[in-house]
Regions:
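H-loop (His-switch) and adjacent beta-strand-loop-beta switch element
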Residues: 213-225
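Residue-level detector of flexible, active-site-proximal loop/helix-junction positions
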Residues: 80, 220, 228
């Protein structure tokens, strides 16, 4: 069997100190097969977004093993984690996190340039055209609709050609129709590249469209079903 894209083993994570210490993730163990899509749902405060931050190398765990793309994130220093994020993980958030003074093209190209890609602007142009924004390359975020800004964010996430795409409520700030377009783009990109998609959402129907649905509650997985059972 091929190595999983993601594997967590007995992961614990707490935030705060002393009496204010809160257990966010509790003894989590699961794996995600490469090239599949997983929708994670659960009430607010269940640990969904924190789990994504762990998978993206943006949050440290207290104990346990975190393996993503064959690399042990829990053993990496900050510089190694930054390099890992730059080459292996694409991240899309609910809020678009675009630089307001940069054009759409620059928002996608500059992170690539900083990671040493010489073809940064050409790659950025290709990705923006793939998400339907070839005609908006020189527009700034303020000149773009919410849906267009999220398309820029998706292009930016996909430009380094990551093996794993992580999305935290990517349609949360969008109307229903625009949200559907954004999700279709992400699923198409996943299939086209053979990437693994891990998606946190409040939308049960969206989670059910994934190959697998995981339900979290109070930092634990309480349900884990394949697509056939999720429908």
């Amino acid at each position: 069997l091929p190595d999983p894209a993601v594997a967590l083993s007995q992961v614990d994570l707490s935030l705060g100190n002393g009496a204010a210490r809160v257990h966010i993730l509790k003894n989590l163990s699961f794996s995600i097969e490469a090239g599949t899509s997983v929708g994670i749902v659960g009430p607010s405060g269940s640990g969904k977004s924190t789990l994504l931050m762990v998978l993206a190398g943006l949050e440290r765990v207290d104990s346990g093993a975190v393996t993503v793309g064959g690399e042990r994130l829990d053993r990496m220093g900050e510089d190694a984690l930054a390099r890992f994020r730059g080459r292996s993980v694409g991240i899309v958030f609910q809020s678009f996190h675009l630089m307001p003074t940069m054009t759409a093209l620059e928002n996608v190209a500059v992170p690539l340039e900083l990671s040493g890609r010489r073809d940064a602007f050409e790659r950025a142009r290709i990705e923006l055209e793939a998400v339907g924004l070839g005609h908006r390359l020189n527009h700034h975020p303020a000149e773009l609709s919410g849906g267009e800004q999220q398309r820029v964010a998706i292009a930016r996430a996909l430009a380094p050609e990551p093996s794993i795409l992580i999305a935290d409520e990517p349609t949360g700030n969008l109307d229903t129709e625009t949200g559907r377009d954004i999700i279709r783009l992400m699923f198409e990109a996943r299939v086209r590249r053979g990437a693994t998609l891990v998606l946190v959402t409040h939308d049960r129907a969206l989670a059910d469209a994934c190959d697998r649905r995981i339900v979290m509650r109070s930092g634990e997985i309480v349900e884990d079903v394949q697509a056939e059972a999720a429908q």
